[in-house]
Amino acid sequence: MVMTSPTRKPSGDVRPDEPLHHLDQPFREFLDGLPADRPPWFCFFSSGLLHVLHHFLRFTPERLNCVFICSGLSKEEAELRDRMSGGRPVFDMTEQVGSHEIFELLVRNLDRPFGIVDVDCFVTETDWFERCMDGLEPGVAVSGPLSYGPIPLAAPPFLALDPRVRPDIERAIGGTVTPAAYSYTAPGPEKEIDGAMVRLIEPHHERALARVVALEGPRLPFPQGGLVDVLDDGREVRSHERYHHLQNGNEVIRVVFDGLMFYQLMALAAGLRIAHFHSFPGTKVFAPQLVHAGGISYWHRLRPSEIAAGINELPWAAHVDALLLEEFNRRADVPASYRTRGTRLAANLRRSMVDMAGLRDELRAKLDSSGVDVTDPRWAVVLG
């Protein structure tokens, strides 16, 4: 069945199995203070990413109702963030949490459409924020320009969603669903999806999945963007690489659906649609309209096996991270921890026979060949 209008969410949607419930009341009070004439766009980041925020703010339209949610920032970081952002609304939390918990907090507490944009997603076409939100027509659960495949799901670095449709989704599938990561079996010590909380797929989910996902075997969905295969040697790899690893003698012992992916599959099973006003494949994008290298917040923490699994993508995250940090550290008010990291990064680069000038030349060439205007002052200040 196709929904034509969402059922209004009850005030204070109570879901005791979701995390961060102690923040619901202060968060709703915070939401009440946001401008009501424009949909909010939430940008979540944690400690250690002010150099990325510094660049993100260059691409943030003045009129955009941009709202920051921050996890675990030091007092010095929070003060510098506020100086840089010019007083944009911020909701601070002391807890160290991941994006999946934030997705749940947002969908549980908002009763109007909102957007999500990663702090390392630099949107050049400022009208794309409006176009993304305009895609939320009746019968649409999520809208965005980046697409997982082969099932065309919107990718989390830049999307808009309508939380009011969740009751309709749950009624159609016969049970609850959240925008968290999901798996058929409990996670092992690997802590898939960067240590995020992983929820278990229940019978009503399996019945709904059967309507929209092809299976290669029992509890083994066909490879799909946003789906992670956990191998028998503990490695976590993209499902698109499955056949390569099977030919090498590995077995898939568990699959994990990344955050918001499973939620969108349940929306499709309920008869709702995913809207795309543009169609970038995947989440790593270098294009005139936006740049999202992806993985900036965690590439340096990856194990060698994880680096090997994404070797064609992660180096660009390293380029962007290093160059943004170098430029940020020119400020006089940078916290000492950022200068320390800059010193360590420079030493690591020397050991790898790489220098900043080389990274700068490579990133400039990558951006230029992708149609990005490298003379744009926002990029020129980083590229030199």
UniProtKB/Swiss-Prot annotation:
Pathway: Antibiotic biosynthesis; streptomycin biosynthesis
GO BP, sorted A to Z: streptomycin biosynthetic process
UniProt-recorded Gene Ontology molecular function terms: dTDP-dihydrostreptose-streptidine-6-phosphate dihydrostreptosyltransferase activity
Keyword Glycosyltransferase: yes
Catalytic activity: dTDP-L-dihydrostreptose + streptidine 6-phosphate = O-(1->4)-alpha-L-dihydrostreptosyl-streptidine 6-phosphate + dTDP + H(+)
Primary enzyme class: transferase
Role description: Is probably a dihydrostreptosyl glycosyltransferase, involved in the first glycosylation step condensing streptidine-6-phosphate and dihydrostreptose.
Keywords of the record: Antibiotic biosynthesis, Glycosyltransferase, Streptomycin biosynthesis, Transferase
Enzyme Commission designation: 2.4.2.27
Protein known as: dTDP-dihydrostreptose--streptidine-6-phosphate dihydrostreptosyltransferase
Membrane-crossing residue ranges in chain numbering: none
Disulfide partners: none
